[in-house]
Amino acid sequence: MLDKRIVDVRLDQLEILKAKNGKEHFEKQYTMGNLLGSGGFGSVYSGHRISDGQKVAIKQISRDRIQQWSKMPGEVNPVPNEIALLQSLGGGSGSVPGHRGIIRMLDWFEIPGQEYLIVFEKPQHCQDLFDFITERGALDESLARRFLKQVIEAVQFCHSKGIVHRDIKDENILVDTRTGDIKVIDFGSGATLKDSMYTDFEGTRVYSPPEWILYHKYHALPLTVWSLGVLLYDMVCGDIPFEQDTDIVKAKPSFNKRISNDCRSLICSCLSYNPGDRPSLEQILQHPWMMESSVDNGDLQEESKIKPSL
């Protein structure tokens, strides 16, 4: 387990949304409903805002599960790093505009000595990409291309704000099953973006690159590109390329599905063993496979018969 530490996040010129201490303040504004999911990060519940009935998702995190803390202007005590990152990406009442491809934090509350509650928008007709692939199987390349482009654009926005997600995977991507629009979720493993090496990692191991498995260090951009390569393989082949550490460090995916040469080329490029050989995000977007046309909204609506899980 990582040592608990305070991570300073630059949030200058933001109007910071301040926590309303105590559960009674939360209960005056929101109603918590059924459990949607749980894991090492905590639990997520459905809910709604009392003032207007807006549906929301509420993430409940116990204090003892929080590994990274941040100082925020206007707050006396450090807050969970995830809250600071989401605030700088346009969450709450801050002045920074958000991005359509990133889930928006609406509010947050501290229950002193116990937990934090983070309130998110709850897009309708959505399910995570993991379930989307599980129910549908391997995706057509045109649909995978469309999803990947949106994920990259969301990641680029994060990087422009000095933030790296560090846990890009199918479970952290919501798909609107009517329109094909996506939103990146769960910044619990995120960090401030820096040029130097990282020596901590709280993301998903099967999406992590060889340099982390072997040396427990990595740079943010090659790590992100590796995870995008795993994600693309997952979408077009129906499952992730590597399950074991020994396979990750070999960096040689096997293709059990018939996919185009250009798609295979992009996957292998992103999954290069040497971090320096991996493309940049801009180079991925300019790859011949990415330049091909994708399905439009109508095509997705016609094909999708999946019942949304959220």
Swiss-Prot record:
Active site (catalytic residues): 167
Domain Protein kinase: 30-290
Positions that bind ATP: 36-44, 59
Enzyme Commission number, as recorded: 2.7.11.1
Domain of life: Eukaryota
Example of a GO MF term: protein serine/threonine kinase activity
Annotated keywords: Apoptosis, ATP-binding, Kinase, Nucleotide-binding, Phosphoprotein, Proto-oncogene, Serine/threonine-protein kinase, Transferase
Annotated coiled-coil segments of the chain: none
CC per GO annotation: cytoplasm
Catalytic activity: L-seryl-[protein] + ATP = O-phospho-L-seryl-[protein] + ADP + H(+); L-threonyl-[protein] + ATP = O-phospho-L-threonyl-[protein] + ADP + H(+)
Protein name per UniProt: Serine/threonine-protein kinase pim-2
Organism: Danio rerio
Lineage: Eukaryota, Metazoa, Chordata, Craniata, Vertebrata
